[in-house]
Amino acid sequence: EAGSIIYELKVILAKPEIGQVGGNNSMLSKEITIYISPRISLDERSLKYLEDYGIIDVVSDVVRHEVGHWEFPQFSGRGCPYDWFLAEKIFNSIYKVLRSKKDGDYVANMFMDVVDNTNVAFSLNQKERKYKGLAWFYYDQGKSAGKYTPLYDWFVRVQSHLWMGEEEKELLKPFFNDSSIGEKIDKLVDELFERLELKKNDYNLEILLDKERWEEQARVFAEIAAKLLPLGTPIEALSSGERYGEKSSLEKK
């Protein structure tokens, strides 16, 4: 089911900087590296989620996410950024809004993760399978952070309205911000959906996988993200393993 690029998969028993599972890929070296903590700790809430839905392997979904940046499923032509040329266009569009490279790299990865995850979730759903391991990844990030930082909160909420079911939303609920910050985040979620003409509780793949729109979509995504960056530096890792301040593995240079 993987993309047309042949990757070497490396699994390393080592705790990521935050959370218990992480991954990254390099198209230059054609390697996907997965980091797994030697000792996985599950609290009652996450254990119940995994047991209720018969999830015995969250790592496979992390791998699917990494592959999905380039193509998923195989020979579908669907992926984000899909190739270096399109990746560069996305990065450049975001850099025009966010002058700090640290901000730009992190937000560009967020945008590509949203498109990638939505496509992978849709593709699995077509085979009557779920993308529940990725929701657990976000739970693990929230558990490690204590509460989502505002930008990461927005990033997860956006995805909750695209590809997550009610069970995933309930699982992640403890880490969403409430009060005035939560209200601001909800309004910015609505703003993104309105400006990109997206429908909630829909994959919206005709819009999100339209490569001709990515530069404009990335610009809008960055403009909204810029309203949350002053509220706190994100500490969480993205699905691709990148943390704020790290060079993106999706950037060629």
What are these regions (language model features)?
Residues 1-253:
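Short, functionally important secondary-structure microenvironments
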